[in-house]
Amino acid sequence: MKRIVCITAFAAALAVAAAASARTSPGPMSGPSKAVTSEILDAIALEIERAKSALRIAGALPPYFIGHKLTEVEVSDTVASLGSTTWKKDRHFVTLDARVHVGDYKLDNSNFVIANAERTDGLATLQLPIEATPRIARRVAWLVTDAAYKEALEQIRAKIDTRRAGGTSDPDRPSHTRRAAFVKQEPVEVPALESNDALDRRARAISRVFRGIAHVRDSRVAFTSFLERRWYINSEGTRAHDTRRVSGVIIVATAQADDGQELAVFYSRYGHTAKDLPGDSELLAEARNLAKKLDAIRKAPVVDNYIGPVLFEGGGAVDIVRTTLAPHLGGTPLPEGLSAAEAKQFGGGLSDDTVGLRVLSPLLSVTDDPTSHRSGRRALIGGFQIDDEGVPAQRVEVVRDGFLKTLLIGRTPSKKLRTSNGHARRSAPGGVYRGTATNLFISGKRG
């Protein structure tokens, strides 16, 4: 018999939450974007094609790969304290990211960090007006591609100089892997955002709980409703679309112990919509529980130094897995240009030399699945259908019965892993797209 636990990297606390409210009809849907139309996308694709063939600086390498990511975000946020609104805002914006590679697939500027100039990385971002015309979109695409190209040239020069000085351990490993064009242009409809007025009413009602509780110094209740649409277009012919929808609540309370130590406790839950969140009665109970917990911590005696075993359970067990296991499941090589110690700040997983070795108890197996939306009745918000390089996400069995089967990787290959499994996330400057855990499922056999 197996027990299965799901760890969501984006919001790990969600995975151990009590069962969410019963599923109901999704309500009104968001519909297709009005800001990013097919005409806007066509204009950007034309500019990519033009830049690929015509963008040149005399004596410099031309671009061999250009990728653009359009991101449209709609978000409603509200924060309340002691029954009064302290923040309430609706936001709507569109950004255009350009990624330029110069050289070729064998040796380009990517996965290299220039010391003390980490943001010179062949990437550039500009905001696109909400009511942009195709002409405006094409001009913004030209400007952002030009900026990324100039950075890519600086990056490749520094990378070549570093390699000439012997600053790489694997000069034969390709910089970037080829991918067949992927086309998925159908609109992905998700439930529309909740009304910010409705979220504000809930936040004010729940935040009133902390009125009159003397030991609580500060308290906040925040709700968010978030919609993200993404489009990927590149010079290889990929044209893909994905949409993500998240709603969440967080309750925070602080106090001060008698010895002056600042104390804080919080409660958070996330889902695809507000219908996945606990109801008001449950949130009111959780707020009261936070106040009681804070008082107990405030009055607790100071613990002496302790050396010995520690048992983590519930949310603590999730955080241990999230912080000690999940970051090491990426197979993307550390970026060149820095010492191993410095490069660690940009992330770093297990070496692919460990594939095939035992890394966990034989009772445990680990699978990462960005395409999962639910685990039982619990909403999972850490996934995606398309990764940050426009590659379709894949379910990957990472560990089976304690043995490492593979690692999570994007288009930057390692010594043994040469094909992306759709897990690339842009997690650091330096043009570094790393294979990253998303919805991590851990299954255990009875021992």
What do these predicted ranges mean?
Residues M1-I4:
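Positively charged n-region of N-terminal signal peptides that target proteins for export
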Residues A18-I386, V391-R395, R400-F403, K416, ...:
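Active-site bordering "gate/hinge" segments
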Residues D352-L357, R426-G447:
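Extended C-terminal subregions enriched in glycine
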Residues I7-A17:
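Bacterial N-terminal signal peptides
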